[in-house]
Amino acid sequence: MINKSFFEIMLVLLASSTGFSRELKLVLSQQRRVNRESLKLLNKLQTSSIQQCLPHRKNFLLPQKSMNPHQYQKQQALAILHEMLQQIFSLFRAVISLDGWEESHMEEFLVELHQQLEYLEALMRLQAEQKSDTLCSENLTLQVKMYFQRIRDYLENQDYSSCAWTIVRVEINRCLFFVFQLTGKLSKQGMEP
């Protein structure tokens, strides 16, 4: 009797683990698709030529540790992805009617970012059962917040000029590419529990 119960419990655990893994892979696949769309839409929001704006370049000091997608635990990676997307969304939501940018492209871009955040929050809920290094995750998200604050300060110091936004758009392109790489890494890992 004990052996039969043990066998049934093991089958249930195995089935739920497989379902969990499939759901994660589906969410990650959707995340990568939406991220590709965000990159395309961001490139449509160009107002000034990049060459014209080169003298206005700035190094926003994206934390180098945050740029290496191969060194994270799952929870850390999810925390970084969430914070980056949340900051990008907040940055662009505040300027939905910037001169020279088509409002429809901006709205599409924001919708895509919002979708990414929803997919990511679903992933984070699925991973919430696992223990994580919250102190390290908090430190990394704080670094990302400081990075985006430097971007906001730059825009303010440049009076939100067209060139400043072009420089920021290029920088955000880097961020979205990083998000794409990190999501790909998580997909390859399978994010198995």
UniProtKB/Swiss-Prot annotation:
An annotated Gene Ontology molecular function: type I interferon receptor binding
Highest taxon in the source lineage: Eukaryota
Recorded GO CC terms: extracellular space
Localization terms from the record: Secreted
Glycosylation sites: N139
Gene3D superfamilies in the cross-refs: 1.20.1250.10
Disulfide bond positions: C53-C163
Keywords assigned by UniProt, alphabetized: Antiviral defense, Cytokine, Disulfide bond, Glycoprotein, Secreted, Signal
Stretch forming the signal peptide: 1-21
One Gene Ontology term from the biological process aspect of the record: natural killer cell activation involved in immune response
Record-stated family: Belongs to the alpha/beta interferon family.
Functional summary from the UniProt entry: Type I interferon required for maintaining basal levels of IFN-regulated genes, including 2'-5'-oligoadenylate synthetase, IRF7 and ISG15, in the female reproductive tract. Directly mediates protection against viral and bacterial genital infections.
Record protein name field: Interferon epsilon
